[in-house]
Amino acid sequence: GCCGAFACRFGCTPCC
């Protein structure tokens, strides 16, 4: 899974 602010910054969506 891709969760966390760092994940969002890496273009991982949707963000948890």
Swiss-Prot record:
User: Per UniProt, which keywords does this protein have?
Assistant: Disulfide bond, Secreted, Toxin
Q: Which GO terms describe its cellular component?
A: extracellular region
Q: Output the PTM entry.
A: Contains 3 disulfide bonds.
Q: Could you tell me which cysteines form disulfide bridges? A: C2-C16, C3-C12, C8-C15
* Protein name (Swiss-Prot/TrEMBL): Conotoxin tx3d
The domain of life is Eukaryota
Q: Which family does it belong to?
A: Belongs to the conotoxin M superfamily.
Which tissues does the record link to its expression? Expressed by the venom duct. Is present in all duct parts with a highest content in part 2 (proximal of the venom bulb) and then decreases in concentration toward the end of the duct.
Protein's cellular compartments: Secreted
Domain comment quoted from the record: The cysteine framework is III (CC-C-C-CC).
